[in-house]
């Protein structure tokens, strides 16, 4: 087992993190109703379109494109970042203004105090960890509670601005661009304009969640719900084999650079508590965990030795650090375990298998299920969101949509109602491995059983033959399930089922899933989603190569692939690429056809659409070619 050095190399950590903006992009901020609501976007600068008019060429300006940006200050060159101190508490003033929380005199968790008082760990700890806060006696500090009181919080206004994708930009572009394709939302209620009131209403109904622990004020508020943009989660975390705090913080920054909307810390190695603190203090996105993993470490990996008291202490420990959502497998009940006996791959969820083993060892109902109301009391005191785990999810397409999976799903619906009674936010985790023809049924059953609580799925993988390429097979399932109504997709990397992902694997998984999420947004008709596609297509047709690179979901790779065969700078203004060459480029030929039609007008056309070749011109062209053929001796091959 690899041992962690009992220190953190701050210089190494700072040097690891990629800070440069994307090519041709800059960070901009849109201000809300108050100066401290500053919503980030990535603005892509575009070059002019060159329009030939006879012997003259005029320029048409292309307005910049603004994109959703979850990368935080890490892509803002103007920001000052000190990893050892963490990010600025963006939401600190908002939390204090509500006057319903209080600073604690110390850490409540027994394990947290034990770690704090261990002098051997002093070099691992963050020197500037904040004092934890908790709801005042009798108070509920969840965003759902505020929403149900009719209160629009600054977080809700922030989210509305963010989700709107700068609608003014949409109106300007629609005046000059093609009308977006009509989507099919399968019953979702996506408005043309996202308002703060709409955000409040969706959270109050339980159809959306805002994961924002009061002890994680560094977060830039975001929302998860099927009436909003589809979000993507990335998993990071140490293991018994690798356990560097520096590596995990770097993976966090790397993940959000490539579009992770939330990050789960699934650490199972050493110094989980300290690793999580560094991640939280430097994360502008919500952080989720699976608390049972750390609880298991506290009993030396013996599931049968777990107790409610140990688990409860772990929840409080992590809530006071600032974890925004907990995956809790409370739906794995004793009676459901035998339902997995005839499965091809049994129980594949780590959390699910831990709880199944505990239930069988004691022949008792799960302590997570039995103590669920007490868990709700903890969650609402810190505003931690439930991510109710699918511990009985299928681990192969042979086991998809079986009795065990759906029995647990109905229990998750029951638990959702209990959580909502406490005004605690809930999302529901889903599979897994599901063949394409069964994907839609998963969403339909989840919406019904769990009362439209947001669905959060791992993939699903739609085939089991793709080790090494599971990010591709699962992204296919993810695009479909996102279209049908899933609110957040948990990424899969090329290393799924094979090993712990490295930095490049994280990027590959995120790119695949950001494409899947965007495809889902297009399919369900999310307003403004198609602007990005139109901008890429226009740049491609006009041979604005630099703009194509800038607008690509992965600019670095797009440019690198182009330059492999056409590396010279003049190739970036050429009207062809290496695929077809200069004589067979369809877009170049299409432009020539348009220009030919413009210079040879006729009153008789095949259609009235702009750019269609006049019919007389087509006929004369046919005659010319026929005459050439006759003069050539009527030979097909010469």
From Swiss-Prot:
Cleaved signal peptide residues: none
GO cellular component, one term: cytosol
Record-listed E.C. numbers: 4.1.99.17
Cofactor: [4Fe-4S] cluster
Keyword Manganese on entry: no
Cofactor binding, per record: Binds 1 [4Fe-4S] cluster per subunit. The cluster is coordinated with 3 cysteines and an exchangeable S-adenosyl-L-methionine.
Keywords: 4Fe-4S, Iron, Iron-sulfur, Lyase, Metal-binding, S-adenosyl-L-methionine, Thiamine biosynthesis, Zinc
Chain positions recorded as Zn(2+) binding sites: 433, 497
Binding residue positions for substrate: 235, 264, 293, 329, 349-351, 390-393, 429, 456
Reactions the enzyme catalyzes: 5-amino-1-(5-phospho-beta-D-ribosyl)imidazole + S-adenosyl-L-methionine = 4-amino-2-methyl-5-(phosphooxymethyl)pyrimidine + CO + 5'-deoxyadenosine + formate + L-methionine + 3 H(+)
EC class (word): lyase
Residues annotated as binding [4Fe-4S] cluster: 577, 580, 585
Keyword Nucleotide-binding: no
GO molecular function annotations of the record: 4 iron, 4 sulfur cluster binding; carbon-carbon lyase activity; zinc ion binding
Single GO BP term: thiamine diphosphate biosynthetic process
Pathway annotation: Cofactor biosynthesis; thiamine diphosphate biosynthesis
Family note: Belongs to the ThiC family.
Subunit record text: Homodimer.
Function: Catalyzes the synthesis of the hydroxymethylpyrimidine phosphate (HMP-P) moiety of thiamine from aminoimidazole ribotide (AIR) in a radical S-adenosyl-L-methionine (SAM)-dependent reaction.
Protein name: Phosphomethylpyrimidine synthase
Species assigned in the record: Polaromonas naphthalenivorans (strain CJ2)
Classification lineage: Bacteria, Pseudomonadati, Pseudomonadota, Betaproteobacteria, Burkholderiales
């Amino acid at each position: 087992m690899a041992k962690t050095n009992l220190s953190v190399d701050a210089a190494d950590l700072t040097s690891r993190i990629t800070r440069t903006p994307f090519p041709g992009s800059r960070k901009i901020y849109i201000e809300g109703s108050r100066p401290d609501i500053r919503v980030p976007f990535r603005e892509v600068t575009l070059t002019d379109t060159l329009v030939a008019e006879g012997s003259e060429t005029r320029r048409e300006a292309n307005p910049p494109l603004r994109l959703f940006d979850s990368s935080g200050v890490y892509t803002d060159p103007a920001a000052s970042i000190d990893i050892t101190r963490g990010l600025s508490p963006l939401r600190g003033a908002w939390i204090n203004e509500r006057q319903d929380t209080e600073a604690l005199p110390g850490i409540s968790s027994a394990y947290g105090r034990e770690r704090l008082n261990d002098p051997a760990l002093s070099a691992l700890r963050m020197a500037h960890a904040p004092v934890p806060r908790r709801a005042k006696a009798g108070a509920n500090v969840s965003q759902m509670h505020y929403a149900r009181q009719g209160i629009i919080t600054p977080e809700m206004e922030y989210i509305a601005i963010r989700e709107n994708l700068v609608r003014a930009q949409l109106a300007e572009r629609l005046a000059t661009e093609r009308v977006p394709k009509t989507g099919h939302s399968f019953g979702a209620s996506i408005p043309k304009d996202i308002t703060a009131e709409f955000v409040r209403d969706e959270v109050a109904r339980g159809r959306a969640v805002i994961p924002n622990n009061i002890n994680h004020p560094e977060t830039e508020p975001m929302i998860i719900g099927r009436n909003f943009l589809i979000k993507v989660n990335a998993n990071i975390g140490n293991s018994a084999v690798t356990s560097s705090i520096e590596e995990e913080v770097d993976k966090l920054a790397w993940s959000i650079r490539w579009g992770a909307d939330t990050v789960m810390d699934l650490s199972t190695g050493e110094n989980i508590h300290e690793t999580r603190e560094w991640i939280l203090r430097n994360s502008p996105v919500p952080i989720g965990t699976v608390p049972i993993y750390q609880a298991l470490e506290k009993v030396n990996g013996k599931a049968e030795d777990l107790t409610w008291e140990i688990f409860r202490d772990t929840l409080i420990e992590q809530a006071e650090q600032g974890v925004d959502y907990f995956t809790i497998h409370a739906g794995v009940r004793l009676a459901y375990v035998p339902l997995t006996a005839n499965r091809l791959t049994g129980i594949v969820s780590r959390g699910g298998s831990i709880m199944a083993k505990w239930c069988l060892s004691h022949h008792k109902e799960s302590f997570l299920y039995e103590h669920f109301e007490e868990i709700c009391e903890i969650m609402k005191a810190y505003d931690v969101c439930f991510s109710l785990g699918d511990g009985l999810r299928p681990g192969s397409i042979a086991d998809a949509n079986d009795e065990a999976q759906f029995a647990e799903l109905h229990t998750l619906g029951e638990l959702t109602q209990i959580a909502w009674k406490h005004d605690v936010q809930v999302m529901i985790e889903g599979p897994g491995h599901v063949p394409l023809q069964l994907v839609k049924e998963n969403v339909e059953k989840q919406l019904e059983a769990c009362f439209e609580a947001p669905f959060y799925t791992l993939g699903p993988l739609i085939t089991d033959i793709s080790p090494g390429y599971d990010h591709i097979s699962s992204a296919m399932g993810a695009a479909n399930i996102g279209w049908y109504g899933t609110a957040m997709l948990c990424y899969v990397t090329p290393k799924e089922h094979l090993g712990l992902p490295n930095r490049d694997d994280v990027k590959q998984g995120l790119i695949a899933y950001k494409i899947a999420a965007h495809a889902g947004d297009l399919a369900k008709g999310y307003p403004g989603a198609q602007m990005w596609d139109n901008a890429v297509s226009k740049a491609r047709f006009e041979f604005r190569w630099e703009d194509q690179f800038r607008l690509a979901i992965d600019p670095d790779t797009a440019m690198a692939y182009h330059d492999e065969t056409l590396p010279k700078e003049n190739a970036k203004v050429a009207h062809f690429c290496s695929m077809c060459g200069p004589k067979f480029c369809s877009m170049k030929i299409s432009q020539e056809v348009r220009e030919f039609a413009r210079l040879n007008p006729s009153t008789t056309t095949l259609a009235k659409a702009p750019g269609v070749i006049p019919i007389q011109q087509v006929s004369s062209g046919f005659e010319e070619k026929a005459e050439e053929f006759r003069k050539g001796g009527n030979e097909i091959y010469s």
